[in-house]
Amino acid sequence: MRGFRTIRTGGLAGFILAITMLLRAGLLDAEEIKPAADAPKPLSPRESLERFQLAKGLKIELVASEPLIADPTGIAWDEQGRLFVCEIHGYNLEGHLDIIELNKTGKLDKKIRRIYATPETLAEARKQTYGRVKLLHDTDGDGRMDRADTWADDLPACFGIVPARGGIIVITAFRIIYLNDSTGDGKADIRETLFDGFEMHIIERAINNPRWGQDNWIYVAGANRGASVTGPALKGKVNLGRNDFRFKADGSAIEPVTGTNYTFGLSLTDSGDRFLISTGSHALYAIPLPYRYLARNPHVPTPG
């Protein structure tokens, strides 16, 4: 081969010489694996907008994008016409930290590292993962948000918000929290835990997507995480099982409702019908029977 010279030797001396040459060439060094230089680049907000395929008669416009917001998980307009956005910072951080440590060894690993992350990286990811709520402003009236104020920070990972009681209720990984700005300085100085005790193992499998119902309850997707929750206004623990659930905005009540396992997203019609989507299927599910009827029949299997 061009660039190589044949070396004739034998025995142990030849083996040692061959290994030495390989080491000098860097072929056996455990060097850190570098990211691919030709990895696809993310689309710009404008390019992403052009990729949407809309049904006839529908229109879509860009209202806010990076760097104004980052990793948004929910939006809500309140009664004053203000737009709030909640964010989650640290999604799949355990996998990222695990990959960093793995790359230092120079070994190639084809496992899905988020699933096989070590207890150490999981613990470190929990420390660094947090949620945030921003208040967006359109200062020039062009329909595009051009200013973002941090309204509430240092929250657990946030998975949805809904306006209530003059403020915002945010759905986080472990608890449901009411936030409000009582002084008008643009910061939420009131932070009240309504319900606590929700579980989260993998970060995307947490309670999410709160929606007001016509019955003045707030409905939440349960995401297949069992929970026995407490709250300052509750008389005792409430077992939600692995169901979707609904709660009162003042924290006075919370109860399970009919819902599929692994629910990530829901919507309610004007007549009160609830539709779900699950990670296990592309289909939308309708919920025709109330939980109280299904739960009282021991011969009917129901989620949760």
Protein language model regions, located:
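Bacterial N-terminal signal peptides
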Residues: 10-26
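Beta-propeller blade termini and top-face loops
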Residues: 26-304
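N-terminal secretory signal peptides that target proteins for export/translocation
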Residues: 1-9
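Short, internal active-site loops enriched in acidic
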Residues: 8-11, 157
